[in-house]
Amino acid sequence: MITSIDIADVTYSAKPRILVPYKTQWEVASHLPEYRKLAERVEFYKYEMSTKDDFVKFLETHRINGFWLTEEFFTVLGNPSSYIEFFPASLKVILVPWVGCDFIDGKLLRSKGITLCNIGPHAADHVTELAIFLAISCFRMTSFWEYCFKYVENGNVEQCKKYISSDSYEIVTDSYHGQEMKFPSRTDKCKPNKDRKVVHLAEKYTVGGKKMESPMNKKVLILGFGSIGQNIGSNLHKVFNMSIEYYKRTGPVQKSLLDYNAKYHSDLDDPNTWKNADLIILALPSTASTNNIINRKSLAWCKDGVRIVNVGRGTCIDEDVLLDALESGKVASCGLDVFKNEETRVKQELLRRWDVTALPHIGSTVADMVIKQTLITLENVQDIFVEGGDGKYVLN
């Protein structure tokens, strides 16, 4: 039986064809038996990326039924949205092996008969792990201590202890880039010994004037209460006995679906939504309604010394306002895995602050996730191209 015919430079196969782009890394767990079994029914077309022009020519001359996106695609060829007008009529689905899809217009795809699928709620555990790490860092100032221990005091534990109860700063030079930055002073450098007073640590357990405390028994406001937000709430409640409050754009979650008590807030313009939180965690997508949710007005309603974690999207925070709030102490510290302008250059003022834990968008970046996202994307492929369904996790 003939299953493919070569015409010019184009090979037409009888199987549904799933485009999988790569250049220097292969992001699909193709060693899995599930992949190999499904490869008997569909063709996983490995496309080696080169230039944007070459990719456009490829789209114009090849039949593609599915497009399995990879992170490397963004690095090499840019946003896939810029190629929508070149997508062949045969394209039936865009397969996104992660959660966030705000980089592409799902409604526009649907108007062209293209389904947009992601991996549903299956990244929640790994993003939650990072959110908890960032929350701990915010309360315990672990990023400051690590930097201080490794690069300032060169492993001298006793010298590190001299930062406790400090409330003044000095300008130091970043050992990596040679840039100046503000950094807490050691207490033995703040004043001459004869002028120093005995410090009551129970009242002033601070570094740089900012309190170090346990996350136990605190109140958290979670903005965005889908699968990730709910999982974060569950873990913070179980591990730290935190009181959970949340905002969800589509309304409250049924209490029977949660294994903990959580207070719902319906209005972000109500000061009562913000006033009790010791910690705010953002797990929101990037939309017009979530843009700059953390702003001057919302922070004014917060407690002094509130702490902020963002594992959603960088567009949700007005970064200039956040910097001002960190400087004034309105925000004690923050943990950020996402930023504005990630495609170009993240705001350097944030990266140089001692009270910011900054990570390069690694919410679900673990080896386990490569396996998991492959298996779930295969479920979408199986449902659409073998079983004739619409896809397991459809977004549009």
Curated annotation (Swiss-Prot):
Residues at the catalytic site: R313, E342, H361 (proton donor)
Induction comment from the UniProt entry of this chain: Glucose-repressed.
Residues reported to bind NAD(+): S227, I228, V311, G312, R313, D337, H361, I362, G363, S364
InterPro entries: D-isomer_2-hydroxyacid_DH (IPR050223), D-isomer_DH_NAD-bd (IPR006140), NAD(P)-bd_dom_sf (IPR036291)
Protein name: Putative 2-hydroxyacid dehydrogenase YPL113C
Organism, scientific name: Saccharomyces cerevisiae (strain ATCC 204508 / S288c)
Keywords per UniProt: NAD, Oxidoreductase
Role: Putative 2-hydroxyacid dehydrogenase.
